[in-house]
Amino acid sequence: RMLASDPYVDAATIASLGGEKVSEKSLLAQSDFVAVFMILNEQTRHFLNAERLALMPKHSYLINMARGPVIDEVALIKVLQSKSIAGAALDVFEQEPVAADNPLLTMDNVLLAPHSLCWTDECFDHIAREGLGCLAAFAKGERPLSVVKP
């Protein structure tokens, strides 16, 4: 069962994609996995705050594929430390670059991944060219142009 909450998409459109439109509170309270996809603006900054995170079941996981500041990171750290939710998968942080002492970096119930914003043919062409260039530089013992910092 896929639940969705979006103020800009009607129930029929969501149903045509295999989902069921519900309120944000219902979505948070009923979901095993909450995947976040939203733009960052003044209305969405800290959208997932302590109050909303508290609605999530203890066995649930939060997956943020939006922007870091849509989640109140201090509140997220608290719910993860207290095991109020099972875990989180993040590829963005509220403050970037992320501080070396950020607790999210060392938590066993957090999965971290590099962030990739772009999803267009042009972007993939660029990624392929840049990736091959980095591999070639590495093979020659040179430092690649793009290095993901740990």
Question: How would you name each of these model-derived features?
Answer:
Residues 4:
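Conserved SAM-binding motif I beta-strand of class I
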Residues 1:
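Residues at the starts of beta-strands that form the adenosine-phosphate
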Residues 7-103:
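Rossmann-like adenosine-cofactor binding region
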Residues 94-150:
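C-terminal helix-to-coil terminal segments
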